[in-house]
């Protein structure tokens, strides 16, 4: 199993073109960097060989403050209501996104903060008010990531799963949801009437101090169409191991969808960074993590990915369950020396429509420090950053 995975990765690397390019000055400003904070236990490695830890406010505070020190542009937390089980109890232990990010907003000063709303669990008027509150805490640095919900057991356990027809109507639901949000954030009042929501002189005040950013992570046609109409930017998965531009067709689809609406909606790409002094040392880490893959948890993920038969084949959850690199849910993975990772991230920045990356790390605290000290200074697309001047714990 391990050998075949390695062979598949080598094939992908050999097939991927190596790009030689020079970034224009204006392009350098495009490449935003974010951290996908570990709100669930063990981060994004489903392996008995990976660091094992519980999510805590103190851990995430240290991560986001360190990210802010190194000029990361934003921090995002997901929402997960039920995990995958297995030996590692993967994602069986999770904090809640809005309350975590409210706390992090209070202990940071510059970095943009995003929480995720599981829209089946929270009425839009409540999310509008919570977001306005965190806007006040953060001084206008807050935004909302909207998710429709794909993991049926998360909602069945609470008795709120609306039935499997929801898979084909979830973006209709989300469209009404965001229209209510926009009403309440814009004017403080909504009388919206739809199939899913009925507002009757609904009020929210105070309103946010700045326009509230809304983000989404749609890769299906319906998801991209939603993002093209309503999102400020759209997350997508990177693909493969050391194939930094393999996501380019997805970014092109998003760009085309946005052109149909006359809006500018860029792609922010999810990657895991596994870096070390040399390529071989980083590769050894990656192989070690794969050798400890929690097969029981991975089997549960595969089973769940097959439940949605109505959204098409190009969805986030289908990619997550692909066996090629399931140990880190098949997000794009950059494995190499600090210089190699910097070069690959510059290649990401060269893809039309790619405006930023959302990073995870095998070890978040040391990973962010190594990124800030050893990787970012080598990146052309981050050359505009000021020099570091303050100490970080």
Curated annotation (Swiss-Prot):
- What SUPFAM superfamilies does the record point to? Bacterial luciferase-like (SSF51679)
Annotated keywords: Flavoprotein, FMN, Monooxygenase, NADP, Oxidoreductase
Please indicate which superkingdom the organism of origin belongs to. Answer: Bacteria
**Gene3D superfamilies for the chain:** Luciferase-like domain (3.20.20.30)
Q: Where does FMN bind?
A: 79-80, 145, 154, 170-171, 220
Q: Which GO terms describe its biological process?
A: alkanesulfonate catabolic process; nitrogen utilization; uracil catabolic process
- Molecular-function GO term, any one: uracil oxygenase activity
Q: What's the Enzyme Commission number for this chain? A: 1.14.99.46
Swiss-Prot/TrEMBL induction comment: Up-regulated by the nitrogen regulatory protein C (NtrC also called GlnG) and repressed by RutR.
Function field = The FMN-N(5)-oxide reacts spontaneously with NADH to produce FMN. Requires the flavin reductase RutF to regenerate FMN in vivo.
What is this protein identified as? Pyrimidine monooxygenase RutA
Lineage runs: Bacteria, Pseudomonadati, Pseudomonadota, Gammaproteobacteria, Enterobacterales
